[in-house]
A protein has these predicted regions:
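Tandem CBS (Cystathionine beta-synthase) repeat/Bateman regulatory domains
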Residues: 1-145
Length: 145
């Protein structure tokens, strides 16, 4: 399978944009960004450093289901601080294994100390579908001669 960097090279438009919040933003502000941008998770940055990740799942479990107020709660209260990351050279198969084993849907992609992207389970599934469609097309061409 291909490296993560190849997946990112095939992205277009806003799917290449990296969305972030700070630990001191309210959960409401984070949820608003998630909804406006149509993404499932945001990186949490503080002083230029990756300090966490916050997802729709975090909001649901730690705010909505506990009856807390998203306008009064901070991102730092619900974010995952011990973030699993991959680098641009990590193979997509390994990313899929990490996501499956850890039951997560997003992985920040870090090159050195710089966050260069966010990989989602959707990215991986779309890539698998494209690969399968290509294989089918090649097989059909071979069969037809």
């Amino acid at each position: 399978m291909k490296p993560v960097s190849e997946l990112f090279n095939n992205r277009t438009g806003s799917s290449n944009t990296l969305w972030s919040v700070t630990p001191d933003d309210t959960v409401f502000e984070a949820i608003k960004v998630l909804a406006e941008r149509g993404v499932g998770a945001l990186i949490v940055m503080e002083k230029g450093k990756l300090v966490g990740i916050v997802s729709e799942r975090d909001y649901t479990r730690k705010i909505a289901l506990q009856g807390k107020n998203s306008k009064e709660s901070l991102v730092r209260d619900i974010m995952t601080a011990n973030v699993l990351v991959v680098n641009p050279r990590t193979r997509t198969r390994e990313c899929m294994a990490i996501m499956s084993e850890k039951n997560i849907r997003h992985l920040p992609v870090v090159d050195g100390d710089t966050v260069v992207g966010m990989l989602s389970i959707r990215d991986l599934m779309n890539d698998i579908i494209r690969d399968h469609e290509f294989t089918i097309s090649q097989l059909e061409s071979y069969i037809k001669g």
